[in-house]
């Protein structure tokens, strides 16, 4: 009778132990907390953290020692306001005597140029019925028709003008516009040389620009002067005909 209850007791204990192992939870109640342990040894230093943001600027430090070298020159500033007019200075020393007017070449040259311009203006004004400027030249006419030699004389008062002689297409077009306006022919400042067909300006230089009518010149030395048609083309002609006088200045 005593052996059965003892065997039953062992069986219950075995079953109770099996239940505790499977659930890993003991059914016993928690015990009373123990006393805190003593402080352990200090741990090792941790790894460096990420770089933080820059801090605010610190206060200005005291002045340094010796001054540094001067810096480079800056840019030129804007001009300032005009200053007040200064007082009149003392007269300078008297200069050396100048040359008499008739011996001063520069003065004589200037006076000659002024005289030339005055006479040239007078010549242009005497032909002021029609004037046309091309480059540095002025072409003018008084509308009168005369023989070549009379035209030559009327264009050269005091040697400031001459009979118009085109030396470029632009000048030829300008003279042609005057001829067309008056609806007549005009003499040009050209003459035939000793050799038939060779023409020269009145200063003796060979002609470097021409605008002959087709087939001209064909006077074969008998027509020494040159006339311009209303279309601007040229023809050789004897010098006794009456043609429009056009001058250039």
Curated annotation (Swiss-Prot):
GO molecular function, one term: carbohydrate binding
Domain C-type lectin intervals: 133-249
Positions of the UniProt region annotated as Disordered: 29-102
Top-level taxon in the UniProt lineage: Eukaryota
Name of a matching Pfam family: Lectin_C
Biased composition regions of type Basic and acidic residues, renumbered to the chain: 42-51, 84-93
Signal peptide: 1-20
One CC-aspect GO term: collagen trimer
Keyword terms: Calcium, Collagen, Disulfide bond, Extracellular matrix, Gaseous exchange, Glycoprotein, Hydroxylation, Lectin, Metal-binding, Repeat, Secreted, Signal, Surface film
Sites where the protein binds Ca(2+): 216, 218, 235-236
Domain Collagen-like: from-to ranges: 28-100
Record GO biological process: respiratory gaseous exchange by respiratory system
Residue numbers of 4-hydroxyproline PTMs: 30, 33, 36, 42, 54, 57, 63, 70
The keyword Lyase is assigned to this record: no
Localization per Swiss-Prot or TrEMBL: Secreted; Secreted, Extracellular space, Extracellular matrix; Secreted, Extracellular space, Surface film
Disulfide bonds listed in the record: 155-247, 225-239
Known glycosylation sites: 208
Matches recorded under PANTHER family: PULMONARY SURFACTANT-ASSOCIATED PROTEIN A, PULMONARY SURFACTANT-ASSOCIATED PROTEIN A1
Subunit composition and interactions: Oligomeric complex of 6 set of homotrimers.
Functional description taken from the UniProt entry: In presence of calcium ions, it binds to surfactant phospholipids and contributes to lower the surface tension at the air-liquid interface in the alveoli of the mammalian lung and is essential for normal respiration. Enhances the expression of MYO18A/SP-R210 on alveolar macrophages.
Entry protein name: Pulmonary surfactant-associated protein A
Organism name: Sus scrofa (Pig)
């Amino acid at each position: 009778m005593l052996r059965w209850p003892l065997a039953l007791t062992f069986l219950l204990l075995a079953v109770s132990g099996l239940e505790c192992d499977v659930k890993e939870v003991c059914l016993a109640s928690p015990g009373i907390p123990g006393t805190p342990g003593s402080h352990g040894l200090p741990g090792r230093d941790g790894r460096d953290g990420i770089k933080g943001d820059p801090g605010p600027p610190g206060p200005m430090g005291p002045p340094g020692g010796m001054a540094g070298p001067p810096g480079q020159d800056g840019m030129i500033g804007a001009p300032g306001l005009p200053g007040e007019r200064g007082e009149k200075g003392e007269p300078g020393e008297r200069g050396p005597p100048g040359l008499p007017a008739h011996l001063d070449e520069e003065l004589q040259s200037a006076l000659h140029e002024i005289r030339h311009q005055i006479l040239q203006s007078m010549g242009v004004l005497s032909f002021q019925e029609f004037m046309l400027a091309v480059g540095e030249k002025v072409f003018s006419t008084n509308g009168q028709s005369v023989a070549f030699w009379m035209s030559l004389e009327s264009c050269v008062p005091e040697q400031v003008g001459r009979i118009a002689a085109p030396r470029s297409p632009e000048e030829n077009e300008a003279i042609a516009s005057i001829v067309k306006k008056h609806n007549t022919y005009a003499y040009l400042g050209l003459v035939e040389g000793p050799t038939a067909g060779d023409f020269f300006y009145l200063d003796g230089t060979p002609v470097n620009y021409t605008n002959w009518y087709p087939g001209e010149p064909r006077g074969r030395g008998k027509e020494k002067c040159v006339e311009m048609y209303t279309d601007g083309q040229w023809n050789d002609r004897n010098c006794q005909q009456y043609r429009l006088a056009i001058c250039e200045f």
